[in-house]
From Swiss-Prot:
Keywords: Methylation, Ribonucleoprotein, Ribosomal protein, RNA-binding, rRNA-binding. The gene is rplK. InterPro entries: Ribosomal_uL11, Ribosomal_uL11_bac-typ, Ribosomal_uL11_C, Ribosomal_uL11_C_sf, Ribosomal_uL11_CS, Ribosomal_uL11_N, Ribosomal_uL11_N_sf. One or more lysine residues are methylated. This is Large ribosomal subunit protein uL11. GO terms for biological process: translation. It comes from Sodalis glossinidius (strain morsitans).
Length: 142
């Protein structure tokens, strides 16, 4: 018989750096999950990813307090900031431009995020990523 789902917990955790401190501890502690077990499993699964990159994770908690989790790709904004070599986006993206990304970089990010995005094709996903870049104050060059 299938296990009964008790809750879904969505978090963003730095790759390879999950520990019982907030936000992981309180979110999983409320559901009665073994926090250290999750931290070890998450860190093992994300060891191939650049350390410190925020990784969205969806944890499915079952009624017997067991869990499974699915990791997603890093947010587009984080990948764009990394590609442009900037710390943060612009506070006034329509006036102040803070950096530049090439259309090749945008396409590469779209291909990286293809598994998580619901776009019809890479071109549509590239346009979506380019829109995110513009809203952060980045200039997309051809």
């Amino acid at each position: 018989m299938a296990k009964k789902v008790q809750a879904y917990v969505k978090l963003q955790v730095a790759a390879g750096m999950a520990n019982p401190s907030p936000p992981v501890g309180p979110a999983l502690g409320q559901q009665g999950v073994n926090i250290m077990e999750f931290c070890k499993a998450f860190n093992a699964k994300t060891e191939s990813i650049e350390k410190g990159l925020p990784i969205p994770v969806v944890i499915t908690v079952y009624s017997d307090r067991s869990f499974t989790f699915v990791t997603k790709t890093p947010p587009a904004a984080v990948l764009l900031k990394k590609a442009a070599g900037i710390k943060s986006g612009s506070g006034k993206p329509n006036k102040d431009k803070v950096g530049k990304v090439t259309s090749a970089q945008v396409r590469e990010i779209a291909e990286t995020k293809a598994a998580d995005m619901t776009g019809a094709d890479v071109e549509a996903m590239s346009r979506s990523i380019a829109g995110t870049a513009r809203s952060m104050g980045l200039v997309v060059e051809d």
